[in-house]
Amino acid sequence: MPDIPTKRRLSNGSVIDNTNKRQMQSSFVPEVEQESDGYLSEDSSDQPIFDMAVAANSNQWQETITKVVKSVVSIQFTHVSNFDTESSIVSEATGFVVDAKRGLILTNRHVVGPGPFCGYVVFDNHEEAVVKPIYRDPVHDFGFLQFDAKSIKYMDVTQLELKPDLAKVGTEIRVVGNDAGEKLSILAGFISRLDRNAPDYGALTYNDFNTEYIQAAASASGGSSGSPVVNEDGHAVAIQAGGSSEASTDFFLPVYRPLRALRCIQESQPITRGDIQVEWSLKPFDECRRLGLTSEAERIARERFPDKIGLLVAELVLPEGPADELIKEGDTLISINDEPISTFIKVDEILDESVGKELKVVIQRGGEEITQTIKIGDLHSITPDRYVDVAGASFNQMSYQVARCYCIPVKGVYINDASGSFEFSTFEKTGWLLETVDDKQTPDLDTFIEVMKQIPDRQKVTITYRHVSDLHTESIQVIYIERHWQSTFRLAVRNDKSGLWDFTDIQDKPLPPLKLEPQNAKYINIPFENEEKQGCASLVKSFVQVRTVAPVPMDSYPYRKEIGYGVVVDATNGYVLVSRRFVPHDMCDIFVIFAESVDIPGKVVFLHPNQNYAIIKYDPKLVLADVQAPKFSDKPLKRGEKSFFVGYNYNLRLVTEDVKVSGISSLNVPAASLSPRYRGTNLECVLLDSKLCQECDSGVLADEDGTLRSFWLSYLGESNCDQTTDRMYRMGLDVTDVLDVINKLKDNEIPVDLRILDAEFSSITILQGRTRGVPQKWINEFEKVCHDELKFLSVERVAAAKLNQTPNPLKIGDILLSVNGSIVKTMRDLKIMYNKPSLDFKIIRSKKEMDITVPTVETTSLNTSHVVFWCGAILQAPHHGVRQLMEKIPSEVYVTRKNSGGPAHQYGIVTNSFITHVNDKETKNLESFMDAITDIADNTYIKLRLVSFDNVPVAISVKTNYHYFPTAELKKNKETGEWKEIEHKEK
């Protein structure tokens, strides 16, 4: 019978069942999707919560609890980075002091974690102490943290004695811990079982095995992981580890092995751990009989162990392990070295003392008793204690934990964070087994390091890999090795003395990129039976595929990789127009692909601030192909006009269709208020009622002779309410709206001096205008000149000015009548703003006609040119998408993103907020922020004052962690447009 769903007891009771991965959402600090609710969760309880049954001996329990709480601590911790089965998290748990003199705290292994750990503990009197991990068991769910005992000055820390032999069925117990994120909660229960198999928390996560678990009904929830399970005398008989998500059942780890490990630490002895890579399961005698246990063997076992109900049976045997081919699944364990076996406890005792030795193992298989001699392996040797960061991804040696889940050999290179160049899937970041890189085998981590050393930067290489959940399927992929943005190539090694992971740089700089050579490509014309459309056949020669890699989550752009199509607007000089959905900013690596054959790098040279397109430049000398720029029309499309659509659909397949323009509309793409980013504004868009066109992210509208009338672009819009998906809009941008820029590009001139009105306008009906005060004489004037739709333009939003700029005189609700003496009918009538320092408007405001002069804003300052990485937060000046949605900017230090597991995450720096002060020193911009943090030492608490996106101020404290999250900057050279990394030496 399968186990019922089980869960860990971490910070907020997040359920980790046997069909889903662990979900760590700390009640201490809200996760990214919770950030809009505030900075920190409220600690609603400063007083102990006594949730226990009142019995006749309640006075005894009261005395016991009074002593126990002085040894129990709340652990606030973070797993800094992905490693092995665990992802980077911030969470909260419980531990208890087991050696007050040495400052040793016992907690769960899934709290200590297999990888980098940072944390502190809070005692009952709210004294705080930094802790470091000194031991995490390779298999069983326990580990030890250590604090400086001298740092606790205002209370006498007591320690709990570990008494595993006092755990009996029927024993009344208390679980004393940080239940459901409360400071202290005391839960009552009775032990109901001592021989439960270890709970299963699912694949690709940590699981305990080869040990009995104690079962009780205490209804513990999140944050209670690591709580002591004490008896009436105040002895710790077990440690809280997990529980059922469908019942009040809790699972406790017996403290036999923690007690042994504690004694080894106290005696400065190594904690040896032996194993033969076999998972055993405790099965009742009736099932053992069905699997081949003889009646005589059962009789002997029942006589030897009258209180036991079964024996250990091999559940799985790992290939290439010490017991491979010697023990089979279904074998019943009888004895080890002539020692009869009935419990996991005895197996652990024997194996832990026999590492490297050969032992005689007796099993029963199919009614036959078999004796095997097996060499005992070292569990620590198959537990990874190092990882490699390179090209934005992280790798470690295959672990026993992962291998056991899928019954595979404990060997190979495991990708614990498939990001950067090794991002195979947006949804699956872990579980990948790397087999070859650049056609070279990578059987282990050291070989992988040597292979990566030989790969030049910007090189495309072929890799093969599998996912451990589907080892039958080998995947092959060409990836781009990027090491100029993410230059880190380092080895991290665990140091149990310091509690840190020591970093060693493997290669300061990658090998330089290989020289590019010209390559041939052949375009195949679009086949048409209709002779009248033969002019459109060669339009395929104007399309190029554009692949974008955005290494830094700048400007709140949600994607790292994008693929779309652009149109060559100048084949002689090498210019491509593409949607800003695919090229959001200029901190990108761009690849331009011709005829799906030739791949050359591109560079962003122009980003239009309103109209949702970017211009990319490539070197035309590197492409030996018949690349053609189309002929561009000088007449705008009109409603009802027929055209021919050529575009690329979701599958990047070329499609065509005859279409009719359904409308020309003045509009703005809806904003993503919870995550502001670039969007098209003040657009005059071509609309089509075509299902096929709405399936295409890129394309063109053309006349039958091939003359281009409109670019078909995709526009990134608002997020759905669940913040998991983004809305995309697909509309046309008339060629005439781009002709001025295209003509400049033909002269190799980049329009860097573009200016805009920093406001958004929307169309309103004549009726709305009349109601809001537009006089009849102006309505008559509009009726004379409007030939398609009668409408006014009204101010919908006014962007917040920068701190050194004068506020825009336009106000929301202003109705535009004329600009520089000409009537404003559509968005196109505002095009004169692009080269004017100011514009003279006649407007209606509050039913009054007035004249105002509105200065325009130069657009080069709208693009981000400075990014700061500090304590896991990514900071920049508020980008244009932010200012468009705000009336006033609190500071020009904007938190655009934060890394999971960093101080920013742990202490509650919220994305989309502004840092206004550091230690009460004002930080108006990034330069003043850098000045404020320069003299702040590592592992130091600092006070930050922040203002949320909704202008709610808050003050928090953040502890710096420069070891794992060093300070760095990226700055753009305004002359060359190149980005340069600036590293900072921390104090």
Curated annotation (Swiss-Prot):
One of its GO terms (cellular component) is nucleus. One of its GO terms (biological process) is lipid metabolic process. One of its GO terms (molecular function) is serine-type endopeptidase activity. Keywords: Apoptosis, Hydrolase, Nucleus, Protease, Repeat, Serine protease. Residues 69-262 are annotated as: Serine protease. It is found in: Nucleus. InterPro entries: PDZ (IPR001478), PDZ-like_dom (IPR025926), PDZ_6 (IPR041489), PDZ_sf (IPR036034), Peptidase_S1_PA (IPR009003), Peptidase_S1_PA_chymotrypsin (IPR043504), Peptidase_S1C (IPR001940). Its main location: nucleus. Its EC number is 3.4.21.-. This is Pro-apoptotic serine protease NMA111. Residues 279-364, 878-950 form the PDZ domain. Signal peptide: none annotated. Nuclear serine protease which mediates apoptosis. The active site is at H110, D141, S224. Residues 1-29 are annotated as: Disordered. Belongs to the peptidase S1C family.
